[in-house]
């Protein structure tokens, strides 16, 4: 009888690719005609991205620019969870985006229930901010991957599959 095969469902992104996308966005903001004199700041910290500029119109343009640059570097735009627009001193506006990393517990429970409902012989286990899925049949695991990829739009986080053993 074969040993159990497993894989992990995670939500993560390549940090260096995000840094590169933000650098490209900063360069484009500095050279683009409609954004050149807006004193726009794009600040990337460990867990969030802050965009500060002169008006909500410029803010929307910079936000779209950042998302476009991220998409071109194969990053999902679901990693950005944008908060409300805030007024700051000098008539400027700011928006903070939290960077999504790891699967929140409520999403992990929904994923585990989805997998259990469709595949009773497969065991999904929540391990911190990842979901480990195990089964004796590799075919069932591949079917689970197909199911989760098809239903990925139901979850507001990007999902990847790693450690397939």
UniProtKB/Swiss-Prot annotation:
Gene3D superfamilies: 3.30.70.860, YajQ-like, domain 2. Pfam families: DUF520 (PF04461). Keywords: Nucleotide-binding. One of its GO terms (molecular function) is nucleotide binding. SUPFAM superfamilies: YajQ-like. One of its GO terms (cellular component) is cytosol. NCBIfam families: PRK05412.1 (NF003819). Nucleotide-binding protein. Belongs to the YajQ family. PANTHER family: UPF0234 PROTEIN YAJQ. This is Nucleotide-binding protein Rcas_1283.
